[in-house]
Regions:
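A short beta-loop-alpha structural element at the N-terminal edge
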Residues: 3-17, 23-28, 183-191
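Conserved donor-binding loop and adjoining core beta-sheet/short helix segment
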Residues: 22-23, 27, 31-111, 120-124, ...
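Residue-level recognition of the GNAT/N-acetyltransferase active site
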Residues: 90-95, 228, 233, 237, ...
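Conserved acetyl-CoA-binding loop-helix of GNAT-fold acetyltransferases
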Residues: 96-111, 232, 238-255, 273-278
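Conserved GNAT acetyl-CoA-binding A-motif
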Residues: 111-137, 253-264
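Conserved active-site alpha-helix within GNAT-family acetyltransferase domains
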Residues: 124-156, 243, 267-285
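C-terminal "cap" of GNAT-fold acetyltransferases
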Residues: 142-145, 152-155, 161-177, 259, ...
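Flexible, substrate/cofactor-facing loop regions flanked by secondary structure
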Residues: 156-238
Length: 293
């Protein structure tokens, strides 16, 4: 019989190994937490990662059978960047179908009225901050979780491409700044850098980047850059601004010792994909976000 219980310290070794096994093939899950860090995250003792915007509230459930931990899930409530209020299953990892179903039932039983998301299309809501570099979509490399969600009535509503660039094979090329455009660079309080394109005193484009050193003490995390956002306002697109900003961001990352850069982009973001591919990025994984109701 499977019982749903709060996480306890004795669950941590089993759940940590279960998590590592589940995400082992997911490229953007490469920088996984060690057992001590994972335990602090599951038990709510971990210091927040400034790079990520944590949920407002969260509950973690463990599926236990015969004293053994068979999986865990998290239910979170958060306000998204657009002001929308959401509730979502932000983690779901399990050893067998029965444990997965019990965990989904526990999350649904604790959720409020309205639509429930699973692995939502946002950053920073998983209790395991390192999961997918903070992106909460469910990696295609974890198909048994997708299968459990769909069998429980969830449907995918967004797909994301996970991309990676080898900066040694494709070093960035400096590009001239278009006439009439000024570039500014400024760090924010989350450890990221914003490069902005200014025209006539107005911001018309920006690119946000950092290394992944905040997410992991692994030396390779400090050598891996991440693009958190790239945008150009309507009316200034197709003028090469995005390419100029990306080239500048990649130059800065190389200057910080990076030899790789990662990003995610919505699968139907057709205008941006030629830019990323031309710079040398390749698709290494995909992820999906789900909803029910």
């Amino acid at each position: 019989m499977i019982d749903i219980v709060p996480p306890r310290a004795q669950h941590v070794p089993q759940l940590h190994q279960l998590y590592l096994d589940a995400v082992a093939a997911a490229p953007h899950c490469r920088f996984a937490p060690d057992e001590a860090r994972f335990g602090d995250e599951l038990l709510g003792r971990a210091a927040p990662v400034p790079l990520l915007s944590a949920p407002r509230d969260q509950r973690v459930f463990v599926a236990e059978e015969g004293g053994a931990a068979r999986g865990f899930a998290a239910l979170a409530w958060y306000t998204d960047w657009d002001g929308g209020e959401h509730q979502a299953i932000t983690a779901l990892f399990f050893a067998d179908e029965a444990a997965g179903r019990a965990l989904i039932d526990a999350c649904e039983g604790a959720a409020g009225p309205g639509r429930l998301l699973a692995f939502p299309d946002t950053h920073g809501k998983s209790p395991v901050a390192e999961y997918n570099c903070g992106w909460n979509g469910l990696s295609d490399r974890v198909p048994h979780v997708a299968r459990a969600l769909v069998r429980a009535g969830y449907s995918p509503y967004q797909r994301e491409l996970h991309m990676a660039l080898d900066l040694r094979a494709f070093p960035p090329q400096a590009l001239p700044v278009p006439a009439g455009v000024e570039l500014s660079e400024e760090p924010d309080d989350r450890g990221r850098v914003w490069i902005r394109a200014i025209v006539g005193g107005r911001k018309v484009a920006d690119c946000i980047f950092s290394t992944l050193s905040q997410l992991s003490p692994d030396a390779d995390a400090a050598r891996t850059g991440y693009i958190w956002g790239l945008g150009v306002v309507e009316g200034f697109r197709r003028r090469g601004l995005a390419r100029v900003l990306m080239a500048r961001a990649l130059e800065r990352l190389v200057g910080q010792g990076c030899d790789a850069c990662w990003l995610t982009t919505t699968a139907d973001n057709w205008p941006a994909q030629p830019l990323y591919l031309s710079l040398g990025f390749v698709v290494v994984d995909c992820s999906a976000s789900f909803r029910k109701g």
